[in-house]
Amino acid sequence: DALIGFAAYTSALPGSRHNHHWQAGGLFAHSLDVGHKALVASASFNVTHGSHSMDREANTLAWQLVVFLCGLLHDVGKVHSMGRVFARTVVLRDEAGRERHDYRPTQPVVWRPSVCSLHEWVSRFDVDSFAIEFYPPGKHKTQHHALWVDRYFHQLVPQPLRAFIYDSDPQIVRLLDEFMQEPLGAAQSALNKAVKDADAISALESLSPGESPSKVHLSNVAVRRIKEFAEDQLWNFPNSTLIR
């Protein structure tokens, strides 16, 4: 249900105007890719070591769900910040039921993400094709798109899944709450690291089609991670994620 709801909002939208995943459907493709890559990376972080043995399996699943969902939703705010989506043509039907697909509306038919999903908008207004009027790069709306993660997490993730997550280990809940407050921010939590690294690698792969991330790209991630650990006085403790 979370994936279907997410697709209803992002579907044919690009991931950016001129950068990575700029094609139609790029936002959904990039988001799903980041969710998957972050899920794979989550195995390198042991955040359930303090759990009771009977709860560890459930807590591990909760951790995996949190990482995947945060990766999936990390760019969802772009539906608000990317630009103005409007109908270019709509479908009209005559009295005989025949359809005309090239009618240009006389009044603007604009999508409002705060009102309904893109899928609902297309269905409700019989939109045949739409375009995006991108906001200027310096405009404030292009910033802080990550701050929408909290809203869409609670809107798109089914209640049973949210209940399962919030009933899990307090450490997992804390990591999720921190991410909601500042997605992809400066926090050096396991969740932020997993999603940020997945985001960076997915973008690089998009900019180099048909190629795997080069050793240089991956080494940049590794160097950044080592610098982060160098600032942590506990980097060489047995429970450090660098040691694990």
For each feature predicted by the language model, list its residue ranges.
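Divalent metal-dependent catalytic cores for phosphoryl transfer on phosphate-bearing substrates
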Residues: 15, 44-219
